[in-house]
């Protein structure tokens, strides 16, 4: 039997392990393809936590698949979610992807002011060199989405926000403009899709690469609760931190009084209590179901 038989799926151990990120493991299928496997690991404040979130890898994969299908832009997918090259043990949280020459920047788009963007704005009135109007507050909607790139850091290090000029210097004006325009266009379309479902896409991070023809291709994960901030549209009001469908719940617990942990201590964060694990899992699943309109229980490999 060949690999086209579902009974003859390869073992994960048959593939060469190329790299491990905070959440994903990358394996080589052949000269032109990789297997991208999303784990249940969760990271916060540049630490990989000791506690995993059950089903998180499947939610990330399901959300990425939904948006790769919904967004009209070339992407790195090279097979269906049940591709015979995917081992049984990782079905539902793995994708067969084209190998790309990845761009050296995280392509962040912000439609609302929060997080590190808000911190920078309060100090300088700008975000990544972009001057913003006066009087903006926590969670303010920006006049238009802004492109705020960051350098790619190694696991355990901080990504560093940079100005658009830095991207131009590194990649040239044409490629830098292409990255910015593509990022903002994809964010804008995704924000429309989410808002139709009652969800605000506050900001997100994309990664792009070049294929064998030198064409720009959307890679990695896309518009997941790991790479994006999602807020419920109902009850949204600028001026305070919004409830979220992403890992902000974990961040809030870690920096709250119950954890006993200081994010500036350099010490590994404590294990998450079961209540935080379950609440985080529920938020991830809720985000997927709300935005996609699909039931997570029908996703391949799920036992919800």
Swiss-Prot record:
Its EC top class is ligase
Annotated S-S bridges: none
Keyword Nucleotide-binding (UniProt): yes
Query: One GO BP annotation here?
Result: 'de novo' IMP biosynthetic process
Recorded catalytic reaction(s): these are: 5-amino-1-(5-phospho-D-ribosyl)imidazole-4-carboxylate + L-aspartate + ATP = (2S)-2-[5-amino-1-(5-phospho-beta-D-ribosyl)imidazole-4-carboxamido]succinate + ADP + phosphate + 2 H(+)
What EC designation does it have? 6.3.2.6
PANTHER family the UniProt entry points to? PHOSPHORIBOSYLAMINOIMIDAZOLE-SUCCINOCARBOXAMIDE SYNTHASE (PTHR43700:SF1)
For this chain, the family text in UniProt reads:
Belongs to the SAICAR synthetase family.
Entry protein name = Phosphoribosylaminoimidazole-succinocarboxamide synthase
